[in-house]
């Protein structure tokens, strides 16, 4: 039908090697880098805060080096349509707040009083109390860029060429599982907290 609404073209595409490096860094970031950092920093007597900081700092540096051209291309697109991008950011933020309220209600129904104890959030809060500076740099600057390039650009961008629905589902589940899998190893019930990350991974 001529009046059927058409989605805007998807232009945020990495090159073949940019995709390989972004997705390929996932197992490095999740498993190999933490193990290497723990061995090195424990030998040096460093704290858990600096262990986490070093893992994200290495990933952040790797992503900037390997994805710089992709970031530069997309920054040009943002500048060309700044007003439209700003409207999308604000509307998405408002939608995320609404979705978060709904998710919080679902968690209360499922877990009752235990719904406030997301172990990942507790861990970040505790690290912030112990060492605010490194944790703030990690959470505000390094983690968003690193995670967006792996999950949004890498996984979503790759699958988007074949199926928009599959791209959303896989990238959302991967992003959500990424935040709770370590805690679920100790208690599988912690997998329920994946739903807290679905709104932000969708938007």
Model-derived segments and spans:
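Membrane-interface interhelical connector segments
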Residues: 110-130
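N-terminal, membrane-interfacial amphipathic/helix-forming hydrophobic leader that caps
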Residues: 1-117, 185-189, 195-198
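Short acidic/polar alpha-helix capping motifs at helix-coil junctions
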Residues: 25-27, 117-123, 170-177
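Alpha-helical membrane-spanning segments of integral membrane proteins, especially the hydrophobic core
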Residues: 89, 93, 125-134
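Generic structural signal of hydrophobic/aromatic residues within well-ordered alpha-helices
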Residues: 71, 106, 123-127, 137
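Transmembrane helix-loop-helix hairpins at the membrane interface
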Residues: 101, 130-203
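Hydrophobic alpha-helical segments of integral membrane proteins
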Residues: 82, 86, 106, 120-124, ...
